[in-house]
A protein has these predicted regions:
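Positively charged N-terminal leader segments that act as targeting/secretion signals
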Residues: 1-11
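Non-catalytic interface/linker regions that flank or bridge core catalytic/transmembrane domains
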Residues: 13-57
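Generic amphipathic alpha-helical segments used as scaffolds and interaction surfaces in large
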Residues: 32-36, 69, 153
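All-alpha helical catalytic cores of prenyl diphosphate-utilizing isoprenoid enzymes
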Residues: 44-51, 64-76
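Short amphipathic alpha-helical segments and their helix-coil junctions
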Residues: 56-61, 83
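Divalent metal-dependent catalytic cores for phosphoryl transfer on phosphate-bearing substrates
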Residues: 61, 65-67, 73, 87-212
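Buried hydrophobic packing segments
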Residues: 75-82, 152
Length: 214
């Protein structure tokens, strides 16, 4: 009986802590966007985000940060990594902070409203129980990086470098590359922020969010 109560207490504690972290990340995300992005349309974009699952959605269905709030957490991680890369390359005041905020915070906007929760049977201690898991249900099959550019462009005007950076942030993992396109090489050569955005995304995914390593 005591063991069962302790298990439930631990579950409730973790649930509360996870909700607090999600709210903290949401507050941080909105603050950064409002402080660093002064472009027309940003307020409308943030208001729209409040009506979506952006702040509660996972970053993936089964890979990095496949958990509630993972998408926002990943976006913050990429933003922080991109800031550090730009400061290392150009110095603290040698890069466009607004562009970095737009790219870092919104590069995965395409994942908004694409994940659904379903149930499946899992055996625990010899007993079959139902567990929730994430599935993909994309009602706007526009691609990945290019979809984020498309969605963002409905609210704010992007510079060419911002659009290229978001469009190609997956680098060699992009499905277009797997289909034979190597245009991302041209983008990386011509637009430095595109390369840095890809590196930031990889660092966040494989260093900050690698559960096997952490």
């Amino acid at each position: 009986m005591l063991k069962s109560l302790a298990k439930w207490a631990f579950f409730i504690y973790n649930f509360i802590m996870e909700k607090e972290v999600i709210e903290q990340n949401k507050t941080t995300f909105i603050m950064l966007a409002k402080d660093d992005i002064k472009r027309e349309g940003i307020d409308a974009l943030l208001s729209w985000l409040e009506t979506t699952d952006f702040f509660s959605a996972p970053a993936s269905s089964k890979y990095h940060l496949s958990e509630e709030g993972g998408l926002c957490a990943h976006s913050l991680n990429v933003y922080e990594r991109l800031v550090r890369l730009c400061e290392s390359e150009y110095g603290e005041d040698g890069y466009n902070k607004e562009s970095v905020a737009i790219i870092g915070l919104f590069h995965d906007l395409c994942k908004t409203n694409t994940y659904k929760v379903e149930m499946r049977n899992v055996k625990e201690d010899g007993v079959w129980v139902q567990k929730p898991y994430f599935t993909v249900d994309d009602n706007l099959p526009y691609g990945h990086g290019e979809k984020s550019v498309y969605m963002l462009s409905g609210f704010i005007k992007l510079t060419r470098e911002e659009a290229m950076a978001i469009n190609w942030h997956m680098g060699g993992f992009d499905l277009r590359v797997q289909g034979g396109s190597y245009d991302y090489n041209k983008a990386f050569n011509k637009f430095p922020l595109a390369l840095l955005a890809h590196l930031a995304d990889m660092q966040a995914t494989f260093l900050d969010e690698n559960q096997e390593q952490n």
